[in-house]
Amino acid sequence: MLKNKFNASEVEPRLYKAWEESGAFKPRKPRPTDTPKDNYSIIIPPPNVTGSLHMGHAVNNTIQDILIRYNRMLGKAVLWQPGTDHAGIATQMVVERKLSKEQKQRKSMTRDEFLGHVWKWKSESGGNINQQLRRLGSSCDWSREKFTLGDPENSDDNMSEAVTKAFVDMYNKGLIYRDKRLVNWDPHFQTAISDLEVENIEKDGSFWHFKYPLAGGETYTYIEKDDEGNILLSEVRDYISIATTRPETMLGDGAVAVHPDDKRYASIIGKKVKLPISNRLIPIISDEYPDPNFGSGAVKITGAHDFNDYEVAKRHNIPLYSLMDECGVMVDSEFMPKKYVGMDRFKARKEVVKDIEEEGCLLLIEDKKVMQPFGDRSGVIIEPMLTDQWFVAADKLSENAINKVNDGSIKFVPDNWKKTYDHWMNDIQPWCISRQLWWGHQIPVWYGYAKDIIKDETSNTKKNDDKKQLIEFVAKSESEAISMAEAYYGCRVKIDNNKGKAENKIVKIWRDQDVLDTWFSSGLWSFSTMGWPNKTEELGRFYPTSTLVTAFDIIFFWVARMIMLGLHFMDDVPFNDIYIHALVLDEQGKKMSKSIGNTLDPLDLIEGVEIQELIAKRTRGLKNPDSAPKIAKATRKQYPKGFEAYGADALRFTLASMAGQGRNIRLSVDRIAGYRNFGTKLWSAATFGQLNRCNSSSSYAPKDVNHVLNKWILSEVSKTIDTVTNFIESYRFNDSADEIYKFSWDTFCSWYLELVKPILSDSHNAYNKETRETFGWVFDQILKLLHPFMPFITEELWHNLSESRPKMLIVSEWPALPYDITDESSVSDVKWLQMLVTNLRSVRADMNIPPSKMAPLLVLSTSLDERLNLFAGQLKPLARVSGISLSEVVPRGALQTVVEGVTYAIPLDGLLDKTVERDRLNKEISKIEVEISKIDNKLSNHAFVSNAPEKVVVLQKDRKLSYLDELEKLNLALINLN
């Protein structure tokens, strides 16, 4: 027997363990009849090893698990490949902080010593997120779990080999190269970072307007005009005006650019200006980049410290002046005024402004909000820096990747993301893949000095250090690098990371100390996880993968790169469909963020959390600690008791039901509670079925049923199966969830269960056995349809409702019928019954008639509809009908309703005290009229309508419409009563 209620906290972990131990998460064995369509695979977007489950993970993995469980039930061989990302900068930061608390510093250790600490941390604390994914119900094949950095203790692990082979192969084909280019530089971590790791935040700032004097004291007539050509200003100037938010960078200016169509500056294009402070002469150039309508229309070009300026500088061969070292400190260089050497960039900013003002070249300081780039982990302002890095020639890989999306080989869902993909790919830049970290795949490149330099050094012939040339030995291993070097030098070679040259006729080479961008190894994820570069059975069965489920913000950083690398190495797309899921927002529609304290931990919703712990979580690690009291107050107001334990099923179903294509999810805790109640409703229905011996039978044949109610429910479940299947296949998860919900709650529980009670309660009824078996069979279909969305409660019910199940629900067959069981006549008859019952209930409710009171039903017709006799047993309990009879006239004051053109009446005599009811109705009418008057006063107040937010005004208008509708019903009830 079923227990009184479903205990998610006890059942969910138990069932997950049973699934995993049974091998249900592993792909089934190949069959001789298998075709590619019989295999289905998804690669999990590998979460950071440092991470913990957040709502983005929850919706992403819920959708993946729905697809995985659905395809598994279709009988396919299913692989859901799990794993984690080594998360270079994030992991290194976590371990450095941990060591700092132990009074240890990375820089005081050797590389190997530090990496030993990181691997130890990973074995003890890393990968907690995988346990959290298990708690969500994710049915990954954990026996195949991968780590982007590989497993150094497992000789069979191929992940490191895959990355090294990919790098060497691409280098040999000219797709990877070393270059000096502009990158996002984090002065705190002293490494290049990706655009995704840069957080642009609006801050209070300034625009400093400077004068750059024309060289040689030249002048020109500066004229400003309005849109109609009228002259607003005309004056002779001996300078050009520029504005900047970063005054310190003017020390590295290489030019001033103006638009070719800007007539104000046409006469001075090609001339030079004298750079204040340093007094260097730089040219005025013509370029499309400046906007004549923004500021003065003239732009300083600092090619070594601004991405847009860098492109302008390249077009015009403008010199690049690097101002800072890796710490953001001004460098000692021939173009740098000695005063600034060794200054921090922000101190230099103040000094530059001060010195320019003293030179008389400061025009204006304008206070403005300024977008500033911050490192998302370091929290410091990012500096565009010109550094030596390794790059992928992405433009050589992009054309094929664009074509595969355009020809339909890869499909985006929703398809509007294809435009975003095309935009990025058609404007693709070299991909910086090197990072100045220790944690990661060390770049497989060794360096040595050119042969002529080695020869000169050993013969004591001195050469200028600036002319030294490095030879690159790109190899899959250290021994291979040594062999390559020995072939080049013609003598013995050894590794010496101190970058020596030669000693006792042994040449020294050293390895590149940088590591690869995490996105490089994760870009190989779709095939490296299946054993590449080895030719494995998994690659043959599961590559290309079927569907990628991911967020929009990594379409370029991960998705596009996987497509490019998959096509390059596998000569095939990495996946067929890309489903871009929605963003999870809070109830007010705001993006969830730790900084504003509105995040919700999925595990708190699954397992419950007390208010104090919830507040502690939301106020821990804030970028602005001063906001903690405000966040605590808001949290206490919104969730005064914290959260109940809603269970994984309720959270999953909520996320699925709100995951409409192209729509963000406004997560409501009330809605999660509502879907927990949905599970309770199913549990109650199952209990009712069990008490009435409603078990499905192996001999049950839906096509052989005879009773109209059973034919109807079979017709409805058949339609639901088709609809849900089509919705899942179309990635319409919200529609499929809603369809299951409506059928389960409304059609089955609210109608069928109630309609068949008279049959089930009568053991002598001819249709008792058929109805019990139909009930059980249909409920089984509900469990199957619902299983991908709510796997735990459905599996528990599946086992408890029958002890003879041959298989667990997780590996049972998806509902499908070999024949049509739709009976339109039965559907029509029951639809009529539902309309009649609904209408009768409605008119009774309008008059406040207690459900306990039975009433006769009068039919204004010459003959009784045969359906009244057919459903007499259902009408009496559901519509509280004491008897049915024909009538030629409607009794005075009787309640009336019309169904399919026939009038049905309920006499009021004896059902209620008319005087009491009349008083109640008049009071209700008066209350509503007062509310309508209040709303009218607000809406007629010009100040309210003008100043209130639009949604507040709309809400008042909607309230009025609702009150007017209610008022109409009350007046009608009063008329009927009188």
Outline where the language-model segments fall:
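N-terminal, positively charged nucleic-acid-binding surface of large information/translation enzymes
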Residues: 1-261, 302-315, 319-334, 345, ...
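Glycine- and acidic
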Residues: 1-2, 45-53, 111-115, 140-152, ...
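Conserved short loop/turn motifs at secondary-structure junctions
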Residues: 3-4, 83-84, 114-119, 143-160, ...
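Active-site-adjacent bridging/hinge elements
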Residues: 36-44, 66, 101-105, 130-138, ...
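Structured ligand/cofactor/substrate-binding pocket environments in proteins
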Residues: 56-68, 75-76, 84-85, 162, ...
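Short Cys/His-rich metal-coordination motifs, predominantly Zn2+-binding knuckles/fingers
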Residues: 189, 278, 378, 449-451, ...
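Feature 926 captures the class I aminoacyl-tRNA synthetase adenylation module centered on the KMSKS loop
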Residues: 209, 427-520, 524, 568-648, ...
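Short acidic, glycine-rich loop/turn motifs
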Residues: 212-222, 231-235, 260, 274-279, ...
